Amino acid sequence: MRNIVVGSRRSKLALTQTNWVINELKRLGAPFTFEVKEIVTKGDRVLDVTLSKVGGKGLFVKEIEHEMLTGGIDMAVHSMKDMPAVLPSGLVIGSVPRREDVRDVLVSKGNLSLSDLPSGAVIGTSSLRRSAQLLAYRPDVTIKWIRGNIDTRLAKLKNEDYDAIVLAAAGLARMGWSDDVISEYLSPDVCVPAVGQGALAVECREDDVELREWLSRLNDEQTERAVRAERAFLQQMEGGCQVPIAGYAEVKEGMVHLTALVASPDGKEKYKEIVIGADPEEVGRQAAALLSEQGAKELIERVKKELGN
């Protein structure tokens, strides 16, 4: 029986997601044994600065992809939102399982909603996308950077001078946190989710026909189509973590509905469009073209310059 080595980051969430995929493959009757190999990524090592300063997309996947390309591992389970828009040659996304809740959530002291937080409230996030949209909605709050895993952030909220933090609903759900900890689910109208948020990407080598055949059985077609539209938009905008970019697609009656957003880090400049179509990639490209015409491309270049990228 073939042994499949699965690469994973060391965080509890990453290992939980990896083990979920392994158990699903076993449930489907995949003729493999599995072994998990923990890999430390650059994003795990550098915790004292914002993600945008460390170097954007790929921070949590590059080392893992290197292991896959050199034969150290056979597959890996990633959070889709950590995936760069373009994969290295020789690697493919073999499966996009059914998506979890895509929304961001607010966890606050006193269980207050975003609207009810007092003026000057300190909100913790490590995401420019979240901070830009929070500031657009509540220009009177203060954003303070926060890094670390879910447990670390919840502890910081309790013990440090944060009034609230924003997390992904999917991460909390996968880690088994109950709804009790959540003060408010942020509507995508208020905070458009990240491209790929709530979805997993199971990556493998392009030439591994046997493994790809089994991974394809885990694929959820609606999630995959939605994510393809979001990632096509991201690819066209050439945005990584350095720029507030958001994209969230749903498939309704066979049509892909994509909400796309580009904003300035302070939330004062915002471009947003909803595009509907049958072809996911075309929808993503169309959204990028519309936002670019309005000035989003210039904004991205300006923000990159200001950040020194």
From Swiss-Prot:
It catalyses: 4 porphobilinogen + H2O = hydroxymethylbilane + 4 NH4(+). One of its GO terms (cellular component) is cytoplasm. Pathway: Porphyrin-containing compound metabolism; protoporphyrin-IX biosynthesis; coproporphyrinogen-III from 5-aminolevulinate: step 2/4. GO terms for molecular function: hydroxymethylbilane synthase activity. The modification S-(dipyrrolylmethanemethyl)cysteine is found at C241. InterPro entries: HemC (IPR000860), Porphobilin_deaminase_cofac_BS (IPR022419), Porphobilin_deaminase_N (IPR022417), Porphobilinogen_deaminase_C (IPR022418), Porphobilinogen_deaminase_C_sf (IPR036803). Keywords: Porphyrin biosynthesis, Transferase. Binds 1 dipyrromethane group covalently. PROSITE patterns: PORPHOBILINOGEN_DEAM. It is an enzyme of class 2 (transferase). Its cofactor is dipyrromethane. Gene3D superfamilies: Periplasmic binding protein-like II, Porphobilinogen deaminase, C-terminal domain. Tetrapolymerization of the monopyrrole PBG into the hydroxymethylbilane pre-uroporphyrinogen in several discrete steps. The porphobilinogen subunits are added to the dipyrromethane group. Monomer. Belongs to the HMBS family. This is Porphobilinogen deaminase. It comes from Geobacillus thermodenitrificans (strain NG80-2).
